[in-house]
Design a protein with these regions (language model features):
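Predominantly recognizes leucine-rich repeat
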Residues: 1-113, 117-164
Length: 164
């Protein structure tokens, strides 16, 4: 599987951890892991996926944090942690994701800590999707990231918030 560029999995309700070998797929560009309701953590080696452009971790409700090694994902453009109910803070060095353009964090109900200081280094970040409570966390950051748009997600399932 060394040339695999995209992995998309959904509804692995009983999987508590991902295989460590997943982090050795060098050419991987997209990783979609959704509805893994018992997944508690990502492998620390996640940062070795240096070609990853899209990381979608939707509805991994037991996922409590993102590994600090995520700072190695220098090509990451889209990070979607929507409905990861247990994430309480973003990684300290999230600002090293120098190509991050879109961050979707709608439904991260435990995320109430101030954003890491390094967040102001996300110069390419253009679009954040979150609820009203999390949007307040971005207010101090927006004075540094002047092109950033924080979209407050609606309670209904309209897709109008998606970037065109």
């Amino acid at each position: 599987m060394p040339n695999l560029t995209e992995i998309s999995t959904d509804y692995c309700n009983d999987l508590v951890e991902l295989p460590v070998g997943l982090c050795d797929i060098f050419h991987q560009r997209k990783l979609h892991i959704t509805n893994y309701h018992k997944l508690a953590a990502l492998p620390e080696g996640t940062g070795k996926l240096v070609n990853l452009e899209v990381l979608r971790l939707r509805s991994c409700i037991e996922l409590s944090n993102l590994p600090e090694s995520i700072r190695g994902l220098i090509k990451l453009r889209i990070l979607d942690i929507s409905d990861c109910l247990s994430i309480s803070k973003l990684p300290k060095h999230i600002g090293e994701l120098c190509n991050l353009k879109v961050l979707s964090m709608k439904g991260c109900l435990s995320l109430c800590n101030p954003l890491p200081e390094s967040t102001i280094d996300l110069e390419q970040l253009k679009f954040v999707v979150c609820e009203k409570e999390r949007a307040k966390l971005w207010e101090p950051i927006m004075e540094f990231l002047t092109e950033l748009k924080v979209e407050v997600a609606e309670k209904d399932n309209k897709l109008n918030w998606l970037p065109k």
